[in-house]
Amino acid sequence: MRSTNLIFFSYQNTAFFRPLWHTRFIRKRGNLMEQFFEDIKDLEVTTVARAQEAIDQKETATFFIGRKTCPYCRKFAAKLATVVVETKAHIYFINSEEPSQLDALQAFRSTYGIPTVPGFLHVEAGDVTVRCDSSMSEEEIKAFAHL
C-alpha cells in the first residue's frame, strides 16, 4: 500500500488532514495572484467612470478589465506587462472584483458588449473596440492598442 503524506491543520476548532499536494496547490495559487499584481504594477488602476469619460471625451485610451482570481486574466496580464515595458504604453486597469464598481461595471459591459474577462478595450475618437481573448499574442496586443 502506498503511503500518502498528510498534513494536519485546524480551523475553528475542527481538525483536518489534507494531502501534502493540497498545500502546494494553495501556495502556488497564492503566488500566481501575487504575480498578477506584479504584472499590472505599471498599469493605472482606474474606474468605470474614467473609461466612460474617455469614450465621451473622444480620447485615445486603452483599458484592461480583469481580476486576480481569473486564470485567463493572469495569462493575459503577463503578456500585457511585457508589452507595457517594451512600449512604455499608458494602459488603465479596471478591477472587475471591486465591490464599489460592480453595478457600474455590469452596465458598462452590457453597453459595450464585454461578455467576459479579460476585457481589452481601445478607445479612439469615441470609437470603442473590444476584445476578450486571453490568447492574444504580444504582437496582437500591440496592434489592437495601436502601439
Task: For each feature predicted by the language model, list its residue ranges.
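Short Fe-S-cluster ligation motifs
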Residues: 99-117
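Non-catalytic, surface beta->alpha helical segment in thiol-disulfide oxidoreductase systems
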Residues: 116, 121-147
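Short, positively charged and aromatic/hydrophobic N-terminal segments
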Residues: 11, 16-22
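Thiol-based oxidoreductase modules, predominantly thioredoxin-like and allied folds used
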Residues: 65, 89-104
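Local sequence-structure signature of Cys/Sec-based thiol-disulfide redox active-site neighborhoods
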Residues: 50-87
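N-terminal leader/targeting and pre-domain segments
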Residues: 4, 22, 27-61, 147
